[in-house]
Amino acid sequence: IIENVDFSALFADYAGIKYPENMQGKSFRENLKGNTSKDWRQYGYYRYWQHQKDRPGHFGIRGKRYKLAFYYGKGFENNHKQADENTKFWDFYDLQKDPNELHNAYKDSKYQKVITKLKKELLEQRALLGDTDEDSKKIQNSIKTYWNSTF
């Protein structure tokens, strides 16, 4: 999995510039040659900050096969209510079976072990990147209230 932050590391690598340790990202130069290391990341973390009715604020992870997103921004903006939303806090997709993300399989019992694993990975990614929302009680309350929801 390659993330946007990896491009600056790649460019620095090709330019022969030492990449600052305090910056996120890893050069994927060897990946381009077909030499992906075994310790290369398995999941990419992302964050969507906007709080729109059709796509509220959320964060998630994506791997080769699965994608999991938590919609913490339900009802934050535009005076809309949670009942107006198109989803209920979680989206989960099996990208192998549903590459267009048309079927939210979050409630599907056959994926519950995978979802539990991905939730743990999502928390680890947030901590690793320092994206913990410690300064937002509103987001923390949403996480606390709906993290274990089974809608």
What does each model-found stretch correspond to?
Residues 1:
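Catalytic nucleophile-loop/oxyanion-hole region of alpha/beta-hydrolase
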Residues 4-8, 13-91, 95, 113, ...:
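C-terminal cap/loop subdomain of S1 sulfatases and analogous C-terminal strand-loop tails that border
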